[in-house]
Amino acid sequence: MEIARVVIVVLGLALVPWGSRCRAEETPTEPPRLASDPHTDARIAEALRRVSPDRIRQTIEKLVAFNNRSTISPQDEASIKAGKGIGAAREWIKSEFERYSKDCGGCLEVKTDTFTEQPAERIPSPTEITNVYAVLRGSDPKQAERMVLVTGHYDSRNSDPLNGTDPAPGANDDASGTAVSLECARVLGKASAQLKFPATIIFLAVAGEEQGLDGSKHFAQMAKQQSWKLEAVLNNDIVGGNLGRDQDAGIVRVFSEGLPAAAAEIEIKRIRMLGGESDSASRELARYIADVGRSYDAGVKPLLVFRLDRFLRGGDHSSFNQQGFAAVRFTEFREDFNHQHQNVRHDDATGIEYGDLPKFVDVDYVARVARLNAATLAMLASAPAPPAGVKMQTKNLDNDTTLAWEPSAGATAYEVVWRSTNAADWEYVQTVGRGTRASLKVSKDNVIFAVRAVDAAGHRSLPVVPEPER
């Protein structure tokens, strides 16, 4: 596709005042750009420099010191006082969020989500499970209901998922992901006075992951039942960048679902008919993370993996997918399974040291992953709301494309992005001004389109793929 040949015409809505229509109908003077061009907010870049590998190390070591954080480990008052078990870990995480809030002038609301999980395969008796989270409220009353979320699970396990007493350090799986969530809370909380994020950011640590994603299922169901406008979920699970020889410390995998888990059969048929198998909301979130990775020097680049998760494994992002939310998983490039779900031991015959211990975690790598997460959260929370009601006219047989959408809160302009149907990421972008309707001399038969909102500072929303409309 030769982008120099693309012509865009922007049209205003028929019912807006004539003066506004004149401004909206101005034809863009600039040609389409490559979608891979970076766009950086210097204030966000400055905030990312405050991510501390030392603090991340301290967080991981502290979580490991609780000995066994299994969901079925002790959480009575005596265990909490002794600093052992998941109850003690829960209280410490809560105290850390509270400390971060104090440091940013009370910017964080610290909360818990507690429920009782009934007996199941990995839950031998009714068990209390608590998710701990902190909320950084959006500064714009018109956008504060919009939410983005980062999470990791703070429970751990050893070789036996029903062993709640013997050591289960869980340094990589998943103290590393919990450390990312905590560090994002600390850094973005302090930065919020300057950045004044219009939308709300939630920093979450869930339990029950190793027993069946119990904590995240409950939290995602709560978000659905309460009609949260949750636009993005970043799940960090096994982001310790183990120090194995084949590890690539410059890459973090980002997994995303294709066909939405929550889609009804009629919607799946429509997706297949339109060729939208790679355009779920989660897939668009993954592409957004790739864009952030090009725009900010986090020290690690996202490798987009277009599947829900690794083989034989699962994660908390899928709980949110099941409820219809866009959610992705961050995981290190190459895993060392000797240091996951293993009893701590040394095999004299092979010389292999088993166990998920802190010494096998690369805290500098975790810090880089935290920067990528923080940059993504900051960009999403700074951006306008994604356009709603995005439609593509299909009533006539023609080689052009007409798109229309509803105005977004906080937007000063809109962009149309597109890519070839066989391309993994967006290839071209065209700014179309303040109008809410655009006609393009590009055939809808040959490409995938989406529309995103942009504010005056250049923060871009998640892109929204249009629905056909006759």
Where are these regions (language model features)?
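N-terminal capping segment at the start of a domain
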Residues: T29-K84, D297, N338-H339, D348-T350, ...
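Active-site-adjacent mobile loop/cap segments within catalytic or ligand-binding domains
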Residues: V64, V239-P260, L304-P384
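Conserved aromatic anchor
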Residues: N399-G410
